[in-house]
């Protein structure tokens, strides 16, 4: 079978290396490529992708637009974002990755979620499924946060520090930190948290600061990615637990 990841930009993605090494190690004759699709070309290119590939993953900024071209699962419909496609059907495995990465961790409330895109939708949906009720969304544009259509309180970005000061858990679902940028949150606000969760795979300034301040639970996007990738392979019907654990540990070390 033939798979790929679509996004823009997507060159930074480790998915092709992970999946191709997994296929090789598991003795599977499959391939996983990369398709960088600018937003203005999406409507044309997505038709080609659906014809050319058995399945694919969608990342920023295409998770929401893919919905119109596939038959979405119930979870994907509620989240309004698809990140995994197999033979015309769309799924959201991000939220599963969030839930599984939080196993054994108490998510204390209130919870602050920074961002209002596809990753934020998955995080909020996962938290609601876990029974978390007091969720505060902080976003640059209030209108986009309102469009989430979840039972959450909404705040503007300039309120972030004062909101975090009153919270117990913080989830960053934006790309802030990927290039060394810092979220505008003071040490005083961060040190009162019991959980900091950043969807970015590596140590961002937020993660480094939280560690120095002694925040009890710190989770990075690599753990979410682990469970999300596992779920993708299960949907595609080609999951081998032993091989996956081995390959993932090597690729992300």
Swiss-Prot record:
The terms under GO molecular function for this entry are: NADP binding; shikimate 3-dehydrogenase (NADP+) activity
Family (UniProt): Belongs to the shikimate dehydrogenase family.
Pathway in which the depicted protein is active: Metabolic intermediate biosynthesis; chorismate biosynthesis; chorismate from D-erythrose 4-phosphate and phosphoenolpyruvate: step 4/7
Q: According to the lineage, what is the superkingdom?
A: Bacteria
Per its record, how is this protein called by name? Shikimate dehydrogenase (NADP(+))
Active site, renumbered: 63
Q: Which InterPro entries match?
A: Aminoacid_DH-like_N_sf, NAD(P)-bd_dom_sf, Shikimate_DH-bd_N, Shikimate_DH_fam, Shikm_DH/Glu-tRNA_Rdtase
Quote the CDD domains the UniProt record gives. NAD_bind_Shikimate_DH (cd01065)
Q: Which organism is it from?
A: Thermotoga maritima (strain ATCC 43589 / DSM 3109 / JCM 10099 / NBRC 100826 / MSB8)
Q: List the lineage, top down.
A: Bacteria, Thermotogati, Thermotogota, Thermotogae, Thermotogales
- List residues binding NADP(+): 74, 115-119, 139-144, 199, 221
Q: Which residues bind shikimate?
A: 13-15, 59, 83, 94, 201
GO annotations under biological process?
amino acid biosynthetic process; aromatic amino acid family biosynthetic process; chorismate biosynthetic process; shikimate metabolic process
PANTHER family, A to Z: BIFUNCTIONAL 3-DEHYDROQUINATE DEHYDRATASE_SHIKIMATE DEHYDROGENASE, CHLOROPLASTIC, SHIKIMATE DEHYDROGENASE
What is the purpose of this protein? Answer: Involved in the biosynthesis of the chorismate, which leads to the biosynthesis of aromatic amino acids. Catalyzes the reversible NADPH linked reduction of 3-dehydroshikimate (DHSA) to yield shikimate (SA).
């Amino acid at each position: 079978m033939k798979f790929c990841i679509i996004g823009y930009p997507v060159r930074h993605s480790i998915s092709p290396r992970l999946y191709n090494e997994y296929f090789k190690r598991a003795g599977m004759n499959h391939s996983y490529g990369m398709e960088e699709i600018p937003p203005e070309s999406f409507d044309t290119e997505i038709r080609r992708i659906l014809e050319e590939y058995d399945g694919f993953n969608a990342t920023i900024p295409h998770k929401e637009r893919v919905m119109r071209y596939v038959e979405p699962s119930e979870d994907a419909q509620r989240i309004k974002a698809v990140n995994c496609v197999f033979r015309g059907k769309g799924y959201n495995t991000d939220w599963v990755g969030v839930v599984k990465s939080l196993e054994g961790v108490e998510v204390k409330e209130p919870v602050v979620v920074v961002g209002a895109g596809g990753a934020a939708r998955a995080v909020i949906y996962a938290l609601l499924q876990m029974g978390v009720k007091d969720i505060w969304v902080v976003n640059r544009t209030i209108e986009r946060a309102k469009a989430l259509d979840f039972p959450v309180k909404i705040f503007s970005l300039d309120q972030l520090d004062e909101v975090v000061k009153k919270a117990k858990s913080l989830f960053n679902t934006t790309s802030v930190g990927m290039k060394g940028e810092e979220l505008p949150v003071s040490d005083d606000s961060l040190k009162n948290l019991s959980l900091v969760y950043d969807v970015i795979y590596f140590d961002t300034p937020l993660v480094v600061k939280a560690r120095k301040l002694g925040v009890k639970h710190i989770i990075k996007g690599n753990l979410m990615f682990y469970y999300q990738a596992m779920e993708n392979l299960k949907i595609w019907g080609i999951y081998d637990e032993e091989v996956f654990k081995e390959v993932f540990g090597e690729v992300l070390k």
